[in-house]
Regions:
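Active-site neighborhoods and metal-handling regions in enzymes and metal-associated proteins
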Residues: 1-167
Length: 167
């Protein structure tokens, strides 16, 4: 368990560094380099790099890219973008993997109470709804994780919360 925790901590550190570097004008490939540096400096290897031919250390999905976006130098962050970064690190055979989604710039603050009040703003409306739905689904899954629960119990709670969010 200690090895798993260390791998997860490396991923957490990489995601913090990526979030801190994610500003308007920064390319997704630059964010990839930040994550890879943190991972390698910690003595781990980027899990995604080369897996099934994947060419990067992170998946970077900007705005309407749903999942597993490939970071490029041509794709540059802009004020108000919404980005998801998926990151993995392998340490001594153990894998840490996590994904964070967040907004870019002052109009991109999409974390909890920082969401813009104006639903017509570039970072409001549907992104506000997505952020809330994601938090609600996560909370439902965590509540279902009790001693004796089966994986199907947790997945059922996630499914029901997702269906509620779609209404």
């Amino acid at each position: 368990l200690d090895q798993m925790e260390r791998a997860g901590a490396i991923v957490g550190n990489a995601l913090v560094a990526v979030k801190n570097a994610a500003k308007p004008g920064v390319s997704l490939l630059e964010l990839n380099a930040v994550a890879e540096s943190v991972i390698r400096d910690a003595g781990a290897i980027p899990t995604f790099l080369g897996y099934g031919g994947f060419p990067a250390s992170i998946c970077a999905s900007r705005n309407d890219v749903v999942v597993h976006g490939i970071p490029t130098s041509e794709e540059v962050l802009e004020e108000g973008d919404y980005i998801s970064i998926d990151c993995g690190a392998t340490l001594n055979g153990w894998v840490g993997d996590s994904a964070w989604s967040f907004g870019i710039g002052k109009d991109g603050a999409l974390q909890g109470d920082e969401l813009p009040d104006d639903p017509e703003s570039s970072a409001g409306g549907s992104l506000r709804s997505l952020d809330k739905a994601t938090q609600d689904v996560l909370a439902a899954g965590i509540r279902a994780m009790v001693p004796g629960a089966r994986l199907t119990d947790v997945s059922h709670a996630l499914e029901m919360a997702t269906r509620d969010a779609e209404k």
